[in-house]
Amino acid sequence: MPTIPAGQRVWLLELPWGGLGGGMPAGVTYYKSLTAHAYVGTYLPEALEPYSSKAYSSLRWQEDELNGTEGPGATAAPMTLRPEQRADVEAITAAADRGFRQVHLANDVGTGKTLVAVAAAKAIARARGARTILVTVDRPARITIPSWRRTIAALNSTDGVDDELRWIIMSSDSLGKLMARNGRPRLKVDVAVIDEAHQFRHASKRTSYMRRLTRMDAPHETAPFVLTITATPGHHPGEWGYMSSLYAQVHGDPPARWADFGRALADRGVPLEPSYGKWTWSAEAKDSLQTQQAAISDVRDILLRHDPPLMLTRSAPWGPPPFDVDLVELTPDQWRAYELEWGDFQREMQLARTGKNVARGLAALVRLRQKASMIRVEHTVAAAKAELARGYQVLIATEMVTTAAHPVAEMLEADGIPVARIYGSNPDAEAERMRFQRGEAPVVVFNTPTAINLQAGEQFADGTYATDTPRRGFFHQARYSGLLAEQTMGRAHRNHQICAWSLLAAAGTIEERAGTVMLSRLIASATSTDADASTFSEVARVFGIDWIPAARLADELG
């Protein structure tokens, strides 16, 4: 363990293996017991600042423990809960006040579950005098962790108080870092938020870690409060094992009696049977969709119809497509590559400005966006793969071909994922569209914003239908035109089919600024047609420009 002299502190660092530039920076030591690099001193050298621990990370938690004081938290523009979100928070806290150990939040994509979860966790922790809140998130961690960090910081800003809560955000794949060598948790969790809880529907190492960290086998009265979140809990009730202790509590049983969740349900008449170490529908249920739906309803309603409700569901309203922004945090190496390109851009732009060469300036801007797009391809691919694992078909919208559409498609196909390509001058665009619509290719990469249908359930000319698999959309690059952005989202968000969209952008780069322009245009176009701009107002808060009235933005963009 590092020795910390009086008047100094330790910084734990996220350094790549082998150090920087092939060597270890001066003053940095790797500590096997911490599985981290550390620097001890009175201040952190500027060259090491990009590698310092992030707020609410497990590395920061270790760092705070070593120093005996807490490092700075994150900051973000305040967020305000909508009335229905406040109602959900009140329902969750009411269940906690009644002594229930868990609530499951199953609202649709785009309804603001993250904001609800953070607000509810804060309220429950305050009421209980608790301190430590664990949040587990799904892949890709470089998108999901920053998103949760921003939401926590935003609500801290809204409250305007320091509640001294200790948040730890972990990807489900990293939960082992919170376990000691004896297999026990290294910290006592008071409140846990398990996002995308369907990750834990099967027996696995990470499921075992989650169960131990949340003390699922502990008596109900001593267990931490757990909020599980997913709109897609599993293919059948036998996969809802992450709620086993809650079902035990509702039935007045000890948790151990429901630890084998599939067995407990089967013993109570749910049509399940074991198969290759897992539970699945019985032969009778496999032949009857009605039997399956009835069984799901019966098991779900135990929580949904309970007083107080222990499962919350809220459908996404028809109207504007659910739209949010995911700002990706580049790795230090990616940042270095970006900053080199940024320096080249500034020099080129200065020459263009001096010579009043508009074409040269625009060309420099395009090159920078191309480079920024290339750096982030792997993040878009990771986001798409995560949504495929959740049961969606994925749309990826791009503007550029050689530095966006093509590399994204190539990387997905290299991982064995078929991709429909609707970009460039592809003469087989319709055949590619049909590959996606019929489910032969679960991903479509396209830059055609109009005149194509990509929604679920489309009826074809021959009377057959597209797959009913829900769609999920990503903008790999921001669209400067609000109309084109709306039309792009409308490729799958149409005909009573909901398709949530996210803009992926690298935080602190030209892409983030492009996203601000895109957001402004979207608000302007929505306002000009008297549409509901509330969805896009949520995104404005991410960028910290929610102080600009939508109508004023529309006037300025006139």
What are these regions (language model features)?
Residues 1-74:
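Accessory DNA-engaging acidic/polar modules
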Residues 65-104:
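Conserved pre-motif I regulatory segment
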Residues 99-120:
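Walker A/P-loop
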Residues 114-121, 129-153, 233-239, 399-405:
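Conserved Walker A/P-loop ATP-binding site and its immediately adjacent core
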Residues 165-218, 447-451, 456-458, 464:
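Conserved RecA-like ASCE ATPase "motif II neighborhood" in helicase/translocase motors
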Residues 171, 413, 418-515, 521:
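Conserved RecA-like P-loop NTPase helicase motor core
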Residues 191, 208-314, 497-498:
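Conserved P-loop NTPase motor "coupling/switch" region that bridges the ATPase
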Residues 311-418:
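Conserved helicase/translocase motor-coupling segment
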